[in-house]
Amino acid sequence: MTKAGKHLFLDILHSEGVEIIFGNPGTTELPLLDAFVVEDRLRYVLGLNEVVVMGMADGWAQATGKLAVCNLHAAPGLGNAMGMLYNAAKAGAPVLVTAGQQDMTIRLTEPLLWDDLATMARPLCKWSFEVNSIEELPRAVRRAAKVALTAPTGPVFLSIPGDVLTAMAPEGLDIGEPTRIGAGIRGDANEIAKAAALISQAETPVIFAGDCVANRDAFAEIVAFAEAVGAPVYMEGMANRAAYPSNHALYASTVPRMTPALRSVMQNHDLLISIG
C-alpha cells in the first residue's frame, strides 16, 4: 500500500528517534497537521510564536541529545525564528527545522509567503535543502538527521512544498534507515606528550571549560583532571550550558569577556588549559 508524503515524513522521523514536533504552522503545513489525525507515535506541540517553538526545539535537543524538529510556516515563519535558530547553531543543537513551501506548480510566480527558504536558512545551518519530489523526501530527511546528529552537531533545514506532502509515494519507494557517523577520535600521541609535559611543569595552571564538556557529558572527567592538576576552573563567558559544577572547590567563575578583567585573571597563571 502506498502512502502520502505526509505519512512517510512522520514514519521516517519516528524511525530517527523523534518524539515531538514543536510547531507554529500555517496553510502550507496543513497536510502535515492532517496526518496527525491518525498519528499516535509523535506529538505535535503547538506554540503561538516562532521564537517560542524554535527555542523549545533547541532546548529539547540540548537537554536530551536527541533530534528535535521545529515546524515553521513558509518565509515569514522562518524569518521570525532566525534569532533562535542562531542560538541553536551556536549551541550545536541537533534540530531539524522544516518550513512548508508553496506548491512547486506555482513557485515560478513567486506567490504570497514564498521565498528561497533553503538560501534563507543556509548561513545558520549545517545543511539546507528544498525537497523537490516525493522520491527525494526519504533521502533528504535521512541526510538531514545524519548531518544534524554528526559531531559537531547542529541545526539543519528542509523546505518541504505542500504538494510533496500530499503526493502519493510510488509503489516500493525505499525510505531507508537511520545512519550515524561515529565520533570516536584519538589525539596525536606526540602532541599529548607535549601537553602533558607543559602541565607537569606548570606551577599555577588554570583551566577554561567550554560547552563541549557538557555536550559530551564529560563532567566527571574534567573534575578528575582539575583535581589531579590542582587548577582552578573557569567556564566560558557566554556559555550555553554549565561545563563545570559551580559547587566544586576548584570552580572559580566564568571567563571575563572584557580584556582588562581577563588580563587580571591570566596574570596569576603560567599555563592556560582550554578544554571543550
Please identify what each model-predicted range represents.
Residues M1-G276:
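N-terminal alpha/beta PP-like core and its mobile active-site loop of ThDP/TPP-dependent enzymes
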